[in-house]
Amino acid sequence: MDAFGDYVWPRATSELILLPVTGLECVGDRLLAGEGPDLLVYNLDLGGHLRMVKRVQNLLGHFLIHGFRVRPEPKGDLDSEAMIAVFGSKGLKVVKVSWGQSHLRELWRSGLWNMSDWIWDVRWIEGNVAVALGHNSVVLYDPVIGCMLQDVPCTDRCTLSSACLVGDTWKELTIVAGAVSNELLIWYPATALTDNKPVAPDRRVSGHVGVIFSMSYLESKGLLATASEDRSVRLWKVGDLRVPGGRVQNIGHCFGHSARVWQVKLLENYLISAGEDCVCLVWSHEGEILQAFRGHRGRGIRAIATHERQAWVVTGGDDSGIRLWHLAGRGYPGLGVSSLSFKSPSRPGALKAVTLAGSWRVLAVTDVGSLYLYDLEVKSWEQLLEDNRFRSYCLLEAAPGPEGFGLCALANGEGLVKVVPINTPTAAVEQKLFQGKVHSLSWALRGYEELLLLASGPGGVIACLEISAAPTGKAIFVKERCRYLLPPSKQRWHTCSAFLPPGDFLVCGDRRGSVMLFPVRPCLFKKPGAGSKAITAAEAPGAGSGSGGSESVPTGIGPVSTLHSLHGKQGVTSVTCHGGYLYSTGRDSSYFQLFVHGGHLQPVLRQKACRGMNWVAGLRMVPDGSMVILGFHANEFVVWSPRSHEKLHIVNCGGGHRSWAFSDTEAAMAFTYLKDGEVMLYRALGGCIRPNVILREGLHGREITCVKRVGTVTLGPEFEVPNLEHPDSLEPGSEGPGLIDIVITGSEDTTVCVLALPTTTGSAHALTSVCNHISSVRALAVWAVGTPGGPQDTRPGLTAQVVSAGGRAEIHCFSVMVTPDASTPSRLACHVMHLSSHRLDEYWDRQRNKHKMIKVDPETRYMSLAICELDNDRPGLGPGPLVAAACSDGAVRLFLLQDSGRILHLLAESFHHKRCVLKVHSFTHEAPNQRRRLILCSAATDGSLAFWDLTTAMDKGSTTLELPAHPGLPYQMGTPSMTVQAHSCGVNSLHTLPTPEGHHLVASGSEDGSLHVFTLAVKMPEPEEADGEAELVPQLCVLEEYSVPCAHAAHVTGVKILSPKLMVSASIDQRLTFWRLGQGEPTFMNSTVYHVPDVADMDCWPVSPEFGHRCALAGQGLEVYNWYD
């Protein structure tokens, strides 16, 4: 298939690549990063702007960049110009650049040198370049002339897994080669007697029991570090490697990684290693782990670089992320865990509870009823009071706020509550609230205006106490405001509380896992039909007289809104209000985002904490606008950042079942707990956050399986969409309106990510991610795309409903709203609300007669989704589209979405294909004076296509849907309207397009690399042709049919008909190919090689006449192409 000269249009060009970062190097205050064949340059001058300066596209052609080597300058000045050798795979190129603080200019570039072997290392030798190749040979190359000067092999021509070149001249050049035999071979290329004469190894070093992946030599100390497949790092004393015959001694064997170690770097005082476990470890030269950097996701950290002067470590991962970390001695160090030495003969009794009043005062109570204070500035214990009534059972809680407002509360097993001013404990005020045990205490603070203390007693009664201070500040007043009543449950007490801004409602969580909304002032809350009943204190179960005498206090106010068992049976651990939303955490390893609308609680999104954190204890908002999650992972207390996916603090405390407390301010964070009868304290200066910088956000930790464009947001010039390029280097006309494409991706890492892709910047911003799936996400579908304010609203923004599906027969529906926000780097804010979900095994478990049915395979996977929007006036089904799913168990299933996606119901299914269904696609047929018809096409692993008439099937009274064999099961779809045997094996891509003649073009791509294109005609019989009362069923037939057997060299995973005359296809052979249609068999026009391996999905869309079309390719990374009409 030769290209016709007249049809070179369109030509696709790459504008964005998100691939694993495989090369990093610090040059002065700049960072060079290799992503695929592209070179990224960052400015690391923290006094200026920390951002990308330049992206040099396609520098190494089709090779991936694995490293950079900068030519040493005689004066050591690399601040203005640098000569850089860029290498990777089998390619090498030398580039001379001139750079400043905010620009980079390419002065000269050599040709691409294609080697016949893999390049493991490159070193500058007196203006030339020495290259270590994959079969143990060294080549000397002149980059200016572009010719090879020397080619010296070793006598041992084994395959290498790594290499390191040492020396500044050809005479002293030394190569340390890591052979696949797990040995280090040290030899000297200059000792060859004649050209191309093999050189025998000078030394062989063994010790590792796996392949050696990386090595680093520190000349000043004569040390060599090696990283291996055996998950260890070894340190060798080698002396001066340039001198033959030296002794090699193993002086360190470091085990700390849980998987293979990819990279190692030796510094004067540290050893840095990174591996497949996504952890970067900092070691001392004695083999002690000093720091551990965790944050990357996926299959490992592929590249590391260091900046010794600034004490920085830079890591690049498989998730396309680049992070900068501070070595010990920089930033805000942790002070570690220390014992506060409570045990003393002068302090009798055993500790019962501990809490924090601010970050520098610790309160503790003993089993003899004594309350003690420890001041971190004074560093001594002080007894505040002793009360024998609190000796057998005592609860202790300090008021929230920076310094606890100087208040704490005690409660005992006889219904007594005492509020104690910490500075003046003699002014304590007590009230007897109940006749029985006080189960829990919690504080609720509204700014500096209102402070409430909630105490749970018998029978689910919560006493709400209002705390106020005298004008002199030396006395406090405690007044019972009201009483609330919890819903019935076995363990009927509240666990946490918070004010809901502006302060009309109080949010509480209970031990049963429910979240409830109570009115703060019940006397002012008048809601007709609410059903809340107010009773007096004398009527309340277990109620007794308080300090107010026999005054009747209204009590028993029930919640105005309840989310029952939101966190399961283990209980709610915290509730927090921030940014107009309510966040709740629980011991079900998750946290919920909620909001209140019309006095009712509504869940927005459920998020999972880090793996292993089953007890989520709370969350905190940090100054940069993000949040951190507090929780327990086995016997460790963990502070985890959802934004950076990093465990910021880890304290081995023994678990969350002991008494503990946490407090944080901008100056410091503190965590105290009881262990072995002592009060232990962990403090870290600088608050919860750690001083690391995310140069670029990671995308997904595993392969991207699906990509779908949602829509476009247009931002005006007032939002100033940031550009990666310097303004001087922008092309004319590219400074137009800020068009930003919103794209969603699904991945094997079980997450769905919402991306913003500006058309003018060549960048990508991860707006948010959804983590509701328990297995991989395989398919996405979008419907109901609109604007936040409706069709009449001209303000920028985007709303859409998204359906995601994948492994474990799980499907989720959620809504996405994107609005302008000038405070974010992307200038956009994204809000996601989870609407509904469905799992086949859960659906089966709910059936009454399930013992009579065959259970659905829980390992069923949804392979593809299609939205089928029927007519709104159809009877019987109500408003909402259908979602068609291709299933691995051989079924085509139809789900009905109702109530704007809040109800997801399995309606019908068919096992017509009897094998794995790979693709589904829906399209509509419209003809003059005829009813709009909705047709579904499904494709299976045998290469067959089936077409279903959904309009007829969904009509009321239609006989197309067969009744199920048992009540509660879905309907049966019957037989399809037409089948076509398009391929000899599985169909991985499918698309249709209506033609001007009223027909439909159907294109499919197969696993054998073939394409199949045919024209489908839909004909409706005349009413007089129908037999009696028979339904008018459309007749489908194929008019023209063409096949291209060898369109690609591998699976065709994406096909899109752009117009009746143009089609584009993508394959695992990494070629994006354009085909000419309309003149018989599809004709090859041109092809572009892309850099994403194992492409699984493709989506194309028109942007505008000025920006043409865009195409997103998803696989082991993401790449965006564009072409112009």
Swiss-Prot record:
Subunit field text: Interacts with FTSJ1; the interaction is direct, and required for 2'-O-methylation of position 34 in substrate tRNAs. Interacts with IRS4. Interacts with STK11/LKB1.
Its job: Together with methyltransferase FTSJ1, methylates the 2'-O-ribose of nucleotides at position 34 of the tRNA anticodon loop of substrate tRNAs. Required for the correct positioning of the substrate tRNA for methylation. Required to suppress amino acid starvation-induced autophagy. Enhances the STK11/LKB1-induced cell growth suppression activity.
Gene coding for it: Wdr6
Gene Ontology molecular functions: enzyme regulator activity; tRNA binding
Native species: Mus musculus
Gene3D superfamilies documented for this protein: YVTN repeat-like/Quinoprotein amine dehydrogenase
InterPro entries found in the cross-reference section: tRNA_Anticodon_Mtase-Reg (IPR051973), WD40/YVTN_repeat-like_dom_sf (IPR015943), WD40_repeat_dom_sf (IPR036322), WD40_rpt (IPR001680)
WD repeats: 53-97, 105-143, 147-189, 200-238, 247-285, 289-327, 335-376, 381-422, 425-470, 476-520, 559-598, 604-642, 645-684, 739-785, 848-897, 905-950, 974-1016, 1040-1077, 1083-1125
The organism's taxonomic lineage, starting at the top: Eukaryota, Metazoa, Chordata, Craniata, Vertebrata
Protein name: tRNA (34-2'-O)-methyltransferase regulator WDR6
Biological processes annotated in GO: G1 to G0 transition; negative regulation of autophagy; negative regulation of cell population proliferation; wobble position ribose methylation
Domain of life: Eukaryota
